[in-house]
């Protein structure tokens, strides 16, 4: 990493404002100030240790005293913490300040646990490479997690210099906009500097940079930081995929103001308790559902279904409804792992629909007979 974007080794008390310190955090920290503890923000986490920027500089801190049973409460990049004042290496994190927002995905395990990727985030920057075919369903998945986190999402289409002409770029932006209502979609070229100033002007506060490996996140981060801070690896021409360039989550200061959390490429983007986020991504379907004749309409074959009517008249693309159903089912399955009542209700619905299907088949056989 370049030293120009790393925290200063000895920032002043007021310089914590660069990292997002404000009156709200000061009020949260007041109960610790009397014990001589120091406020600081976690800029990097490594297996039980973390780097924390404080008024005294960047200190190495052990998280031994704040190891929770709940994986959602582990110390994460972006957290504000209270650390020991003693000058020793490492110091200890004594407490974690309540988070304002948190970006969470489900883990690949069957234990229904969430993995927190970044804390206290204002903007979720979703990087999507134009060097590969657009996967609108994956973009919608990222957006659901972003909205659920409480952050404002921004979709950044990277490697726009590889698109043959401006008309094609505009068409691709338009396609993504259909999957991202209420979200700004920008096409940028970090190599040529196109669109970087516009993006930088949007990113006040704390932003987290997300995307698959090969999406150009590290190159984009370097362009925003104005320095070669993040290492960049080559991408395979055959599929546009790359290796993990970033292996840890790092919090870095942007020259335009605010801070950026760069994350490793995400192969899996599982939903975690993201019902509200899914609803936000598919706000037009949620609005149509309010006009259905029945309040519990499943949008399958019910009479008076406004969603199906929109499908029939072409105002709602079938792909959008399919994606909406898929993400809702996934979110329900995850929720059912930990909610016995929901699990029983889902079984009841499945049995009822199975019985209805069998009855329909029997009736059909009777008519044919």
Model-assigned labels for residue ranges:
Residues 58-75:
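Beta-strand/loop nucleic-acid-binding surfaces
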Residues 218-219, 223:
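Walker A/P-loop
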Residues 88-97, 135:
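Short, Lys/Arg- and Gly-enriched loop/turn segments at beta-strand edges
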Residues 35-46:
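Structural detector for short beta-strands of small beta-barrel domains
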Residues 48-52:
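Short aromatic-glycine-enriched beta-strand elements
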Residues 2-19, 33-36, 70-87, 97-123, ...:
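Helix-rich effector regions associated with P-loop NTPase G domains
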Residues 152, 162-215:
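Canonical P-loop GTPase G-domain recognition
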Residues 137-152:
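Histidine-anchored nucleotide/phosphate-binding helix
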């Amino acid at each position: 990493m370049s030293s120009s974007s790393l925290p200063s080794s000895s920032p002043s008390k007021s310089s914590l404002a660069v990292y997002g310190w404000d009156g709200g955090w000061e009020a949260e920290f007041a109960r610790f100030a009397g014990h001589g503890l120091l406020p600081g923000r976690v800029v990097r986490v490594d297996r039980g240790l973390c780097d924390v920027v404080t008024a005294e500089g960047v200190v190495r801190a052990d998280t031994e005293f704040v190891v929770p049973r709940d994986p959602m409460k582990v110390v994460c990049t972006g957290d504000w913490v209270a650390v020991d004042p003693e000058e020793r290496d490492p110091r200890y994190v004594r407490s974690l300040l309540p988070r304002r927002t948190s970006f969470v995905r489900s883990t690949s395990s069957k234990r229904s646990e969430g993995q927190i990727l970044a804390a206290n985030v204002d903007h979720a920057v979703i990087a999507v490479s134009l060097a590969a075919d657009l996967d609108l369903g994956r973009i919608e998945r990222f957006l659901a997690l972003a909205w659920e986190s409480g952050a404002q999402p921004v979709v950044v289409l990277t490697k726009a210099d590889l698109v043959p002409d401006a008309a094609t770029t505009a068409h691709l932006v338009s396609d993504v906009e259909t999957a991202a209502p209420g979200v700004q979609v920008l096409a940028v070229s970090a190599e040529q500097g196109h669109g970087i100033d516009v993006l930088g002007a949007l990113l006040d506060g704390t932003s987290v940079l997300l995307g698959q490996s090969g999406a150009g996140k590290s190159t984009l981060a370097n362009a925003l930081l104005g320095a070669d801070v993040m290492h960049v690896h080559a991408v395979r021409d055959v599929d546009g995929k790359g290796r993990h360039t970033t292996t840890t989550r790092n919090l870095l200061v942007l020259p335009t103001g605010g801070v950026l959390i760069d994350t490793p490429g995400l192969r899996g983007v599982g939903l975690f308790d993201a019902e509200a986020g899914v609803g936000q991504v598919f706000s037009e379907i949620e609005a149509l559902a309010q006009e259905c004749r029945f309040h519990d309409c499943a949008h399958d074959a019910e009479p008076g279904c406004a969603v199906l009517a929109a499908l029939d008249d072409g105002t709602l693309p079938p792909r959008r409804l399919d994606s909406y159903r898929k993400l809702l089912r996934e979110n329900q399955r995850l929720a059912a792992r930990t909610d016995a009542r929901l699990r029983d209700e889902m079984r009841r619905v499945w049995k009822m629909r199975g019985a209805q299907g069998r009855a329909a088949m029997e009736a059909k056989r009777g008519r044919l007979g």
